[in-house]
């Protein structure tokens, strides 16, 4: 399975726990359970000015880090692929049987999905939507597209197919929001964080909402699923953890850095601990 990709002071109470849930997990070292926005609105205001958290897996273990200071380099394209003016923004790239699939995401300025032949002298526009990710899974090739900007918040999954006669995409699922971060779990499901929810979609297009919070997700950056089946979504200031239960539902646990139990907004930056 290949991924082609190419974001005041207070005391802090905790969420209540739902039950029953097997195998209660420890909170990652240096992190604590965060309060709801209702319990501590000042913290959530500060979080809107906080730095982003990036989640990843290293040898199956969760790692939480900060994004690099420099902008990530663009995905390099084969030299023979010639881009038009409308092909701009961050890129996703996947080699196909007879060519290349290239996606673009320029936010509110547009995007799209194109197929190029091997020689690069022919291309076909397949979608006019912003492409967030292209996946090659055991069930085929899929593109996650969408946009969250001002009042807009939409997202879709399309399946790409390629034959000797044609290349095309077919609609698989409506995500209900822009796929800001995503991954594929061990069952082959897409696990997607939108600005307002976390959903899972199987290869047949069946969507299941895993979490729709009282809290909007604060600009999701990344999603991973660990060996226990716990889902982690990194975002601005927080990490959301979803712990699977016996009945197939998920218990949400909002996490934040321990030092952020004291915080202050300084020059429109959320500053934690003794840094202010």
Label each residue range with its predicted role.
Residues 73-85, 120-126, 166-173, 207-213, ...:
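A short beta-strand motif characteristic of beta-propeller blades
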Residues 63, 108-114, 150-158, 197-202, ...:
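Structural motif
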Residues 116-120, 161-165, 202-206, 243-247:
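Short loop/turn segments that connect beta-strands within beta-propeller blades
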Residues 1-11:
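Bacterial N-terminal signal peptides
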Residues 14-18:
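Boundary at the C-terminal end of the N-terminal hydrophobic targeting segment
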Residues 50, 57-59, 96, 109, ...:
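Short loop/turn segments that connect beta-strands within the blades of beta-propeller domains
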Residues 32-52, 82-95, 127-138, 175-184, ...:
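Repeated scaffold domains used in trafficking and secretory/extracellular systems
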Residues 53-56, 63, 100-102, 141-143, ...:
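Conserved beta-propeller blade signature
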């Amino acid at each position: 399975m290949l991924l082609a990709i190419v974001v005041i002071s207070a005391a802090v109470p905790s969420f209540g726990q739902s039950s029953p849930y097997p195998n209660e997990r420890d909170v990652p070292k240096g992190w604590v359970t965060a309060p709801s926005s209702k319990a501590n609105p000042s913290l959530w205001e500060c979080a809107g000015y906080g730095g982003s958290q990036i989640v990843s897996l290293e040898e199956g273990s969760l790692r939480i880090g900060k994004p690099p200071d420099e902008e990530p380099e663009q995905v390099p394209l084969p030299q023979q692929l010639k881009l038009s003016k409308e092909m701009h923004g961050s890129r996703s790239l996947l080699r196909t049987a007879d060519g290349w699939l290239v996606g673009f995401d320029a936010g509110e300025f547009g995007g799209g999905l194109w197929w190029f032949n091997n020689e690069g002298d022919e291309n076909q526009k397949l979608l006019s939507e912003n492409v967030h990710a292209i996946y090659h899974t055991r069930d085929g090739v899929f593109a996650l597209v969408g946009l969250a900007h001002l009042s807009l918040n939409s997202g879709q999954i399309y399946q790409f197919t390629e034959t000797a006669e044609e290349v095309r995409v077919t609609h698989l699922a409506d995500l209900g929001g822009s796929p800001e971060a995503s991954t594929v779990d061990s069952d082959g499901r897409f696990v997607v964080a939108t600005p307002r929810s976390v959903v899972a979609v199987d290869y047949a297009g069946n969507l299941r909402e895993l979490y729709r919070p009282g809290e909007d997700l604060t600009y999701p950056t990344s999603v991973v699923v660990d060996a226990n089946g716990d889902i982690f979504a990194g975002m601005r200031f927080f990490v959301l953890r979803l712990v699977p239960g016996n009945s197939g539902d998920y218990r949400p646990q909002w996490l934040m850095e321990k030092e952020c139990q004291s915080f202050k907004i300084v020059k429109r930056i959320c500053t934690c601990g003794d840094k202010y």
